[in-house]
Regions:
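An N-cap/entry alpha-helix motif that binds or orients negatively charged groups
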Residues: 2-72
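Active-site beta-loop-alpha junctions enriched in small/polar residues
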Residues: 11, 62-64, 97, 125, ...
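Alpha-helix-loop-beta-strand connector modules within alpha/beta enzyme cores
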Residues: 40-55, 102-125, 147, 156-171, ...
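Structural preference for beta-strand elements that scaffold enzyme active sites
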Residues: 56-60, 91-93, 119-121, 141-144, ...
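Active-site mouth loops of central-metabolism enzymes
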Residues: 58-78, 119-127, 170-172, 220-226
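Glycine/Thr-rich beta-alpha phosphate-binding loop at enzyme active sites
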Residues: 63, 67-75, 80-102, 181-210, ...
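Glycine-rich phosphate-binding active-site loops on the catalytic face of alpha/beta enzymes
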Residues: 94, 134-154, 191-200, 238-248
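Catalytic cores of alpha/beta
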Residues: 127-139, 175-185, 221-245
């Protein structure tokens, strides 16, 4: 079976280089530095919002996926995330990958301009520091780093840069081989119940891996959460602080 993650990451490296040709890194970096200097405060903390919430729902804005095709091609970033906020979501995850998930960086900007105040997770396949500047530029509070995409050293460098840019990091893991990445002390650790190589989902991943994470870690269970019973079990058995739920 074709490994979808490898395909996506290979394309992402090409895509980033094309973006750099359109907007050189030095120019983007200056824009972000100026933006940070002019801001009244840092973006709202996603970690704090999740820990303060009784349920900790991260509602996801996603138009399509490689496994399901188009979910809602007409979903609008100006309205859907605001509806999530009104209905009690602690944070919003916005897919910004265009080729495979139908997303754009502008979706984050549009949601912010429409009045979204809760934290936004920039959900993409980050393999280059340039993408973290893109995330900060469009108004995200946190960025997703996927352990399977990065060496430990690469992840350490990107995490440090994210913090310099006032971005928190949700570090996503899928199997026990990636538990070493916890030593980097990310702001949040996510256990993805979906295998990103095959897109097969098994919620047992959260039960198995989350129990091996430090008690002090903010734990997020991602994908395959479709029933109240699963929600209750995750929060009770593995002390999951947050649940990432696809709702669009």
């Amino acid at each position: 079976m074709k490994d979808v993650l490898d395909e996506i990451v290979a394309w992402k490296r090409i895509e980033v280089e094309r973006s750099k040709a359109l907007l050189p890194p030095s120019e983007l970096y200056r824009m972000v530095e100026r933006q940070i200097a002019e801001e009244q405060s840092a973006p709202p903390s996603m970690r704090e919002a999740l820990l303060a919430s009784p349920i900790g729902i991260i509602a996801e804005f996603k138009r399509r996926s490689p496994s399901k095709g188009w979910i809602n091609e007409q979903a609008r970033a100006e309205t859907v995330p605001l509806a999530y906020e009104r209905n009690g979501a602690a944070a919003v995850s916005i897919l910004t990958d265009e080729k495979y998930f139908g997303g754009r960086d502008e979706f984050v900007t549009e949601a912010r301009r429409a009045g979204l105040t809760i934290p936004v997770l920039y959900k993409n396949f980050v393999v280059d520091e340039y993408q973290l500047f893109q995330a900060r530029r469009c108004g995200a509070s946190a960025a997703l780093l996927i352990a399977a995409d990065l060496t430990l050293s690469e992840c350490r460098i990107l995490l440090r840069l994210a913090h310099e840019l006032q971005l928190e990091v949700l570090l996503e893991m899928h199997d026990e081989r990636e538990l070493d990445y916890v030593e980097l002390e990310p702001d949040m650790c996510g256990v993805n119940n979906r295998n990103l190589g095959t897109f097969i989902t098994d919620v047992r991943h959260s039960f198995d891996l989350a129990q091996r994470l430090p008690d002090t870690m903010c734990k997020v269970s991602e994908s395959g959460i479709s029933s109240p019973d699963t929600v209750a079990q995750l929060r009770e058995e593995v002390s999951a602080d947050s649940l990432l739920v696809r709702t669009s």
